[in-house]
Amino acid sequence: YSAQEQGLSEGDVITKIGGRSVHIWNDISLYNLTHSEEKEVEITYKRDGKTHTAVLEPRQKEGDTAPLLGVTGGKMERPGFFGTLKYGAYTVKYWIDYTVDSLRMLVTGRVGMKDLSGPVGIVSAVDGVYQEAAPAGLSVIILNLMNIGILITANLGVMNLLPLPALDGGRLVFLIIEAIRGKRVSPDKEGMVHFAGFALLMVLMVVVMFHEKPVYIIEMMIDFME
């Protein structure tokens, strides 16, 4: 792979990829996933206290499911109490970046409506996570479900801050307009805009649900009753 050709070796610590800071291994995985169209990727890494840069070329060999750079994560370490808080914050940041990158891919057409998930998709994902984690025990189930919860929370937070009517981001736009104009926007007009935005969001939710598999819910209900 390209990493070995460019001189990277075991023990090197990647600190940046494509200009983004790397705090956890998932940061690298996310960049590769959401920037798979890039032919070259610049990375910054540390070795023996010195900073180096290299330009890597993603390559997909036989048996690979996606183009790879040739780097892997190191061994897991116990960072202590405060370190756990720090890396917990990095994990939340990762899920926020994941949400923002997903929106970017949606806007640019790299993903379509079939890739969106609504309530049905969320239930399906949670059930899938539970089924995979169940053999490993209760602690793994709780940890994986917490990760799903963080993802959903990050999605809701980012979406709510978008400058769209009916969302907090839309309300913020009106506050900025009022600050520039020096007077308040008519409450009736603002209410109409937010109502129209809410209606469009409901339509979008229905469209997304039609692209999912409602039969999944019926199957779950049958399994539960059995």
Regions picked out by a protein language model, each given a short descriptive name:
Residues S2, D27, G121, L172, ...:
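Residue-level recognition of oxygen-bearing side chains
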Residues A3-N26, V92:
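Conserved PDZ fold ligand-binding element
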Residues S9, T15-K16, D27-T72:
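PDZ-domain C-terminal substructure recognizer with occasional recognition of PDZ-binding tails
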Residues T34, R47, E57-L156, V173-M192, ...:
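Functional transmembrane alpha-helices
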Residues L151-N160, L200-V208:
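Alpha-helical transmembrane segments of multi-pass membrane proteins
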Residues L162-L172:
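Transmembrane helix boundary and interhelical junction motifs in multipass membrane proteins
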Residues D188-V203:
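Multi-pass membrane catalytic core of lipid/isoprenoid biosynthesis enzymes
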